[in-house]
Amino acid sequence: SEPYHLIPQQWESSAHAEVNARAFTYPIGEDRASCVRCHSGVGYIDWANGVPEEEQRTDYQVHTCAVCHDPHDSDSPNQLRVFDTVTLPDGTEIDDAGPSATCMSCHNARRDPISGVEGAVESGRISTPHYSTGAELMNATGGYTWGFDMPTSGHGEAIEDSCVACHMANTPPSGTVAHNEIGGHTFAMTNADGIQNITTCEGCHDGEDSFNFEAFRDYDGDGTIETNDEEVAGLRELLVEALAERGVSVLDHYPYYEIAEGTETSVDLYGAIWNHKFTESGGSAVHNLRYTVALLQLSYEQLLGEPVPNAYILEASIPVAEETGG
């Protein structure tokens, strides 16, 4: 029979419980102290408790219940160690994230785009964001924008407790398909059979049976309006081609990009590289379609000097203060 308490069963099927996952076997230690807070359960506890980075524990440990929740703190909602307030790597302060602050404290780019890109120009070494940029995408930040204001889909504002509302929506009832395989403490949006947890989506997108539904426009200019994911994938492929024209090869392994000898580097080149990596996550279209599309379209234009051909362009704008000199 099914256990009375479902949370442990759900957690056991989550990525947070995968003992042999790369996230929890990645080399950590004194020379990689900044990795500890997210790649070690006890390291996260130390970080949340304000332990100096160089003193945080480096033991290999998955993210168990007591990593996110403090069993001895009844004052914090859900006994979460991090709640409501989180500062993203680019300095963006989120003060109303609720329980999603816990998610955002790790699922972010780990680097600031401006210092990353401009630092790459000075050093000649490519800088890219870390994996899992959901926190930035939900808050329309973290991409390299060349100083433009970017359009946004606004999921971060429209959905209360944004990360948790979608990834932890109730799992389907016992005895039904995908029970304990999506939602809840599985944190999964899709199970192995492709069944999606669209509970939160249905609140606004009535009648849709998938969160990867048809886009409103042809953003990649291929003459066909496809799904949101396909439009983003098309733009990313166009950006790969544009980077190749400028002497950059995209690799499937570290360091992810290779600049040909003799290539003229610039902010435009490094900014486009940053944005290509930033939008790599499969959730980019769902987290913030308009911001993702605008970043990719702008990167293409900055590289080649012209907009994506035949595409519906989401316009980025110069901030009013800069435009007027005020």
Language model features with spans:
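Phosphate-binding glycine-rich loops and adjacent basic patches that engage nucleotide phosphates
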Residues: 1, 65-69, 205, 257-264
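Generic detector of short, well-ordered, non-transmembrane alpha-helical segments enriched
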Residues: 7, 98-99, 197-200, 295
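Divalent metal-coordination and catalytic microenvironments
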Residues: 11, 102, 204, 299
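Short beta-strand-alpha-helix junction that forms the catalytic/metal-binding core
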Residues: 102-103, 164, 199-203
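Hydrophobic, helix-length membrane anchors
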Residues: 177-193, 197-231
